[in-house]
Regions:
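Hydrophobic/aromatic beta-strand elements that line small-molecule binding cavities or substrate pockets
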Residues: 95-100, 121-122, 165-166, 208-213, ...
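Generic short beta-strand segments
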Residues: 24-31, 179-188
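Short, hydrophobic/aromatic-rich segments at coil-to-beta transitions
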Residues: 17-24, 104-108, 172-179, 195-197, ...
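An acidic-aromatic
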Residues: 61-151
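A short, Trp-centered hydrophobic/proline-enriched beta-strand micro-motif
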Residues: 13-85, 107-109
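Non-transmembrane domains of secretory- and envelope-associated proteins
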Residues: 1-7, 202-208, 216-296
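Short loop/turn motifs at secondary-structure junctions and domain boundaries
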Residues: 90-91, 158, 201-205
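A short, structured loop/turn motif at beta-sheet edges
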Residues: 165-176, 212-217, 243
Length: 296
């Protein structure tokens, strides 16, 4: 099958037999360049075709800015990083989070003043003092942000023409390095569809890419995205600990934190805007968006 074919198979099956992972997750982004990446991706899709990636400046690993056409938008409990798009944001952003994952459905991501955690049945998002709980039917590893894309890169390589894999290492761990750029023509449609919950293009942002895949599991250990030869995003896992036991209390809300449901917080928010929450079906995203716009 060849080295490229072997790498495709490895990445397709990621994270393979991985049981647990503990790491530091560092993300860097350049806001204006990311905005240009998304603009070009929108242009490539063409008129009348919805691009699954929001056409806004979204930081790698960041929660997407509000998209009025996304019915799940008000359910996105991804507070690990701030929403991008505000005019007063700095040109560049650098953040580091502590990540611990026990596959398939338990995780903890702790950033500066923000956290997201799941015990496999429920998930929580918020701060060390207040978290919002949501039903596990929406709890997927993609909710943990960039770590989801790193663990499940899936069809990412199928979108790229990439170089012959080169053996490298990160912190002494063997990996495969490739550089790639978007496929064009009929080849761009080949390969299996990407996992929709991971939003790969949003998390691993760039027109051109350099990627380091773990040789044993296929997970992304490092990604560097660029546009017109200029870097726009970096996502890196360091301080790696693979397959070591993890305590069960890692996957619970912080001790003493107030736990509230999304409905409770939404009701309070609507009331603070002068809107009677009893007049809004809080399970209907269309009604919720209309009410929020009314209160602006």
């Amino acid at each position: 099958m060849g080295r490229k074919g072997d790498l495709l198979a490895l990445v397709d099956s990621a994270p393979g037999g991985l049981r647990t992972l503990q790491a530091a997750l560092t993300t860097w982004s350049h806001r204006a360049r990311i905005a240009e990446v998304h603009r070009r991706q929108d242009d490539a899709v063409g008129p009348g075709v919805r691009d699954p990636v929001p056409a806004v400046a979204v930081l790698p690993g960041a929660a997407a800015a509000h998209d009025p056409d996304d019915e799940d938008d008000e359910d996105r409990d991804d507070p690990v990083r701030p929403v991008a798009g505000a005019d007063d944001e700095p040109a560049e952003s650098l953040s580091t989070a502590y990540v611990v994952v026990a596959l398939p459905d338990r995780w903890r991501v702790v950033g500066r003043g923000h956290l997201a955690v799941s015990d496999g049945r429920r998930s929580w998002a918020g701060t060390s003092t207040l978290v919002t709980e949501r039903d596990s039917r929406r709890a997927a590893i993609g909710d943990a942000g960039a770590i989801g894309a790193c663990l499940y890169p899936g069809a990412f390589l199928y979108r790229l023409d990439f170089t012959e894999p080169e053996p490298r290492d990160i912190e002494g761990r063997p990996c495969w390095y490739v550089a790639g750029h978007p496929r064009t023509g009929p080849a761009a449609r080949q390969g299996p569809p990407a996992r929709p919950d991971l939003r790969l293009q949003r998390e691993l942002v760039g027109i051109d890419h350099e990627i380091w895949f773990d040789a044993a599991t296929g997970v992304v250990l490092r990604h560097e995205g660029s546009i017109d030869g200029e870097p726009c995003s970096t996502t890196a896992l360091t301080d790696l600990v693979f397959d070591e036991p993890v305590r069960a209390d890692e996957f619970r809300p912080p001790p003493g934190a107030v736990v509230r449901s999304r409905h409770e917080l939404l009701r309070d928010h609507l009331a603070s805007m002068g809107i009677d929450p009893d007049t809004v079906d809080l399970d209907d995203p269309v009604q919720v968006r209309a009410a929020l716009r009314q209160g602006e």
